[in-house]
């Protein structure tokens, strides 16, 4: 509990049970129900998104992708797009939790049967979403937090392994302020990736060392399209707030020469879709 508290998690109860006698099971159930009642759920995005963890072909059906639905809902017959390849197709069939389904929604395990798509065009790490709403990128502004127990140091321009959703991508961490990041420290960086990823603002990710592979840090996406003159991007990234609402206001001021509609801001802040209108009013 102390370990979780130090890392921003609300510690829940620890329950001792006996599978043979059943002792403690009822207390565990009661504590689980009580915990569920106090957990605050974030407003989910209305846009569908699913990170693909498996791709395979089945005789008589064709290509199937599986994953856990992160946001939104889709139904049989809907048009979707698969990123970063930007392949558009329709849903031929759906399965969820072992049975056929007409639709799947946030939290469901889903198997999506795709129409007229070859298996070799897709891979683990792809993202299934609605057409034209996501943009793959190789330049990302992030905040990195080092694991407190690691002996590793992240230095400027260091090559690392980044895990976004179900994908692993190699890339380099470019410093905006500190030349190195040590255990327990955090700072804003610009990631320059070797292949495109499909992510959104406020997505979390894990960083592993290139070799030997060890988990050394985690992070959050602050802005997903850090293109432009390096000196300008560096200053832009260095001052970018971690808090979503503060970052929203920061971006409005910074991008004031390129006005966006409310819908554009909703797409940009994909995970905070339902908060954007409220932020505008505030």
Show where each model-derived region lies:
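Conserved catalytic-core segments of large NTP-driven translation/proteostasis enzymes
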Residues: 2-150
